[in-house]
């Protein structure tokens, strides 16, 4: 039973990284389209840090940001994907890494960014997993050491991507929103409540986050099971 469960988790993980396993698929092309739209969304300056969030759990934010990290890396950019969801982290599962040392260790000065970052089997893509789940995620993410971490990441990487908790669940995403160059809101087609999505947008803007657009996922299409659309706010 345990082996079967592990196999199911592995299969779900491989499906979630379609840009790696099947880069020529229609869905992978949609991710590349999102990447292009992100890059052209701000004409006067490059976007160095991007946060991806959702209004509620299970809307696909972690799958979205993992695949965006892959397509940015495939473009030749040195990418760091940071798991800032310190409550329900998933990056270490997706990329099959241990999670003994990560964000929380760096923020509490128990490790350096250089020693905590892990290389993946995708060229140019590195991850900083969450590390041990702390009792005070919001305080850590809003600390001065978070600003130091981001500044150091800018020195070492071309693009820094943050996976964060859902906006309506906790304040973590709002805390990070104004530290990032841009934010993407993921919406689950047919599931996300419109009022919830609107409330999430309002909270991000109130936190002085720069909302770049919305990704609509799980939209049924004739050609494929999933469709990702990037639109402005």
Predicted segments with their positions:
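P-loop NTP-binding module
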Residues: 1-233
């Amino acid at each position: 039973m345990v082996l079967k469960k592990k196999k199911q988790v592995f299969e779900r993980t491989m499906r979630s990284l379609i840009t790696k396993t099947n880069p020529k698929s229609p869905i992978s092309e949609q991710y590349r389209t999102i990447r292009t739209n992100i890059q052209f969304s701000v004409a006067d300056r490059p976007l160095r840090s991007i946060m991806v969030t959702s209004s509620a759990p299970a809307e696909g934010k972690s799958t979205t940001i993992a695949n965006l990290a892959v397509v940015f890396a495939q473009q030749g950019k040195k990418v760091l994907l940071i798991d800032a969801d310190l409550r329900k982290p998933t990056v270490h599962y997706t990329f099959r890494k241990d999670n003994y040392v990560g964000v929380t260790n760096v923020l509490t000065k128990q490790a350096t960014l250089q020693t905590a970052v892990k290389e993946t089997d995708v060229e140019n893509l590195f991850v900083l997993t969450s590390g041990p789940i702390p009792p005070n995620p919001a305080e850590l993410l809003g600390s001065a050491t978070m600003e130091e971490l981001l500044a150091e990441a800018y020195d070492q990487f071309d693009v820094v991507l943050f996976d964060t908790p859902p906006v309506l669940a906790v304040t973590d995403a709002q805390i990070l929103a104004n530290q990032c160059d841009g934010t993407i809101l993921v919406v689950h087609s047919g599931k996300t409540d419109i009022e919830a999505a609107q409330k999430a947008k309002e909270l991000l803007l109130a936190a002085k986050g720069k909302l770049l657009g919305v990704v609509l996922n799980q939209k049924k299409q004739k050609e494929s099971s999933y469709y990702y659309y990037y639109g402005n706010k």
